């Protein structure tokens, strides 16, 4: 049974000021600044960069991943419970200098207590672009279950 939640659940987090370095390979997005975190006392953790589902239901998430220059392959992903990985847009080769960004969207079913992370991949070390315009992890509850 679907139910209309009595409390909304939505968050957006970004990389705060500065442009941190990003090592090569898969990295959990260091989104350490909440833009908002509504519902059930907040469900996004700025220390471990995880969203934890407060109720069972269908959720939608997006990850926008941006770096400054010459990534040797790049993609944005969403990972559920440390194992199930959804990958969005992807480039396989070095595409030259300048800003590059990728986005991943996913709608998924979560149980109460499941966690979700934004995963950023580059084939070489990079520098993140900062701010919500360039790097953000966001999500919301679409439908709760009784």
Question: Which residues are covered by each model-predicted region?
Answer:
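Short, surface-exposed tryptophan/glycine-enriched loops
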Residues: 99-115
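Solvent-exposed serine/threonine-rich low-complexity stretches and specific carbohydrate-binding patches
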Residues: 86-95
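Terminal (often C-terminal
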Residues: 1-71, 80, 84, 130-146
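Short proline/glycine-enriched turn/loop segments at secondary-structure junctions
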Residues: 95-96, 125-130
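Short structured motifs
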Residues: 45-48, 101-105, 122-123
């Amino acid at each position: 049974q679907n139910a209309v939640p009595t409390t909304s659940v939505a968050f957006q987090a970004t990389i705060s000021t500065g442009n941190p370095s990003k090592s090569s390979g898969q990295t959990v997005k260091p989104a350490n600044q909440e833009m908002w975190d509504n519902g059930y006392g907040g469900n996004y953790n700025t220390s471990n960069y995880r969203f934890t589902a407060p109720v069972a239901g269908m959720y939608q998430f997006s990850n926008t991943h941006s770096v400054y220059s010459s990534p040797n392959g790049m993609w944005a992903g969403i990972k559920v419970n440390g194992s199930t990985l959804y990958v969005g847009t992807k480039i396989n080769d070095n595409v030259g200098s300048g800003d590059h960004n990728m986005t991943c969207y996913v709608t998924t079913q979560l149980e109460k207590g499941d966690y979700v992370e934004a995963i950023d991949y580059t084939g070489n070390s990079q520098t993140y672009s900062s701010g919500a315009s360039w790097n953000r992890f966001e999500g919301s509850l679409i439908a709760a279950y009784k």
